[in-house]
Amino acid sequence: MALKEILPGKLGFGAAPLGNMFRDIPEAEALATVEAAWNDGIRYYDNAPFYGAGLAEIRMGEALADKPRGEYVISTKVGRVILDEIEDVSARDLGEKGDVFKYGRPNRVVNDYSEDATLRSIEDSLKRLKTDHIEIAWVHDVAQDFYGDEWLGVFESARKGAFKALDRLRDEGVIKAWGLGVNRVEPIELLLALEGRRPDGFLLAGRYTLLDHDRALQRVMPAVAERGLGIVVGGPYSSGALVGGPNFEYAPATPAILDKVARIKAIADRHGISMKAAGLQFSLANPAVAAVIPGASRPGRIAEDRAALQERVPSGFWRELREAGLVNPAAPLPIAD
């Protein structure tokens, strides 16, 4: 089923911060953040076992437990199984993400993309989320940022296991859609080229943003649109770099990135618009994009995101960005006049 037929709106909720991403978030604050999203009208919630070793799913399950299940959509991910066994969180190999979830639960996280592990992962997620079904399952992180030069072997394991299992679950009506949830474009290119596998869309984090969109624009968006699929854009603020944060790609931003942010912000300031509005509205301007899911760890962030989505951005801003070479000339822009 096409993602745009499943997703209830352009703005969703990315739950990674609820897994104590970068900081130890008090339980009450985490639950209040989900409640703020619900009160704002957000009805699409994305999660993953990997986020805090199940913590984000547990918190979301608690926060949504009293909400009518037919009124919202959940996506979660497969590829990691969370065990009862406790491990040293500091010793986890998280690839480029380093110690992103060092404040999460200490349960052992096992990377496993087999068919059996996929089914177990979904079953475990349902328990943590306190629900009897999910709408969308993403195969998580089969890419270079986690597996380096071994990523193609991991992808092959997922092809034989997770892809097969999710194809069957969708055909049986257990889930409505599946695809990849990744931070790199290449795995999506590879899956689109495979015979016999029919993903419904993709969650692409950090690769269709104002700061980084060239490869996705050229290699993924046209194929996705042509096939009637859809993209959910995660990380629209590029790990916070676009809105003044110190990080890009989960690491300190390089001078080149900081310079690009400063140049975009100078233009935004001249036009009196927020960087959040620029980021969200750029991502959504591409017709292949079904939704954006900025993460939030504080209730106030929800209202900021909604305001950014509704903010009027003058066409002159987008034209100036293009003239300055700060966006790809082929990128669709929300120019109204």
Region locations from a protein language model:
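Short amphipathic alpha-helices and their capping/turn segments at secondary-structure boundaries
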Residues: 1-5, 57-73, 118-133, 217-230
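Active-site mouth loops of central-metabolism enzymes
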Residues: 16-28, 103-119, 150-154
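Active-site gating/metal-coordination segments in enzymes
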Residues: 87-135
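N-terminal binding-site loop/beta-alpha segment at the start of enzyme catalytic domains
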Residues: 1-92
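Active-site groove signature of glycoside hydrolases
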Residues: 126-150
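Short, well-ordered coil/turn segments that N-cap beta-strands
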Residues: 7-11, 41-43, 68-72, 131-135, ...
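Short, acidic/polar
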Residues: 24-37, 114-128, 184-192
